[in-house]
Amino acid sequence: MKASDLFVRCLEEEGVVYIFGVPGEENLDFLESLRESKIKLILTRHEQAAGFMAATYGRLTGKVGVCLSTLGPGATNFFTAGAYSQLGAMPLLMISGQKPIKKSKQGRFQILDVVEMMRPITKFTKQVVHGNSIPVLVREAIRVAQEERPGAVHIELPEDIATEECSAQPFEVISPRRPQPDERAVTQAIDMIRSATRPLLLIGAGANRTSTCKALSMFIEKTGLYFFNTQMGKGVVDERHPCFLGTAALSTKDYLHCAIDRADLIINVGHDVIEKPPFYMEQGTAKVIHVNHFFAQMDEVYFSHLEIVGDIATSIEHITEKLEPGKNWDFTYFHRVKHEIDEHVEDKSKEASFPVIPQYLVDQVRVVMPDDGIIALDNGVYKIWFARNYKAYSPNTVLLDNALATMGAGFPSAIAAKIVYPLRKVLAICGDGGFMMNSQEMETAVRLKLNLVVLVLRDNAYGMIKWKQAGMGFQEFGLDYGNPDFMKYAESYGAKGHRVEQTDQLNEMLQSCLETPGIHLIEVPVDYSENEQVLIQELNAKTCVL
């Protein structure tokens, strides 16, 4: 068969359902093979958005998301999405085209060494140099992308190789088994937890697997340990649980850090140092048990005292089975901290001033979203408010990036979420800056006939940087911009545009749009003056003597 046919057959064998991308001239043989396959092509308006969609597909399903681009400028547009996937531990395969490698009459036109360009942001990057190697390369790329820690891989398919006749056949897919934990480490962890006075559980993104969610819920029910999570660990355990303290949206000086500072043992499950630190460790403070699929990456703010490496769910199940509550456990202080956190989150959540303040916005979104509804956040200061104040009830219902923390990923991620879960409510929440970085995908969403709501928070500036600029004592400079008429902008794509002009419209507008088919964009003017007042002044003035 033709090499491009073989490539697509290999992807089918691996269970690939969608390919997101923007094909070019060098992909035409591959595109023809794709036309005759069961795999559905999701044509996007920019390769970066295709990569974000594919990475999010990987995050939500555990399967490898696949995206396609041409050579040169198409492949370079993948780069940010590849880094997003690699740092965020989302399985992603990027396929790029290339000019003929055996005989080309176009000189160096559009040619870059894409394989080497991808090396720093991938786990695996290869060029196909003969068609019969395709089954090996595809199988290895998929395996590497999915194995812990998941991430990005890349294969380059040159134009002339795609036309070769091949005799090779796809490999049979073998499901790998994750390594089991060392029982001696499990026993040592049980002893450390039992002998601690104020053990505290931290849940990170690595725990966001179905089996691990169940295991952690059982662990918490049996022990009654209080827990908190990182931003990317939101929803692993239902945050309505009475033992939930909060999310580490800030690295220091939040109410949550009072509990962290008082803990004498932190059981760190699935956290990855690639996330912005949920706390800063110092020598002589609480001991840390690191439970993950891989060994801890030590740095000056994170170092573990015991490591349990292997399948996280199995590790937690073994601990739960043998652990009995410690005689010296005292969670009184944690209970008081939880009360303070809950009060602070509730404060101003009903304050219907205009423009809308973040606390009210978060509260209203939580009110209208169903338990399994998904919010996809872009990057901006509002992400801190949602991470901190929005309670997630189920795994992967708050999609955010706290690793690369790139702008422009929120809306494409929401599109991918709606493709994966067509019957669930999905809400993209973007700042005006982040939305405009990939707003062209409005056309993609409309063309796919999705039912999706986009909340655009308008402050006409790069608000996060503006806040930091003011905090450093600098004058305002270089961060303000204009915006289109978002209602007309949405309508120009065939979507429905809405604008909140007084705060009491927000709840009804959100509910109506979530229940009405089609693509809806809601423009919401926001007041970020609360950033300085609450996240800096109030938290700096608080005391941990509760």
Stretches with model-predicted labels:
Residues 132, 285-381, 501-512, 516-546:
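Phosphate/pyrophosphate-binding active-site segments
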Residues 365, 377, 416, 432, ...:
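Hydrophobic, well-ordered secondary-structure elements that form the walls
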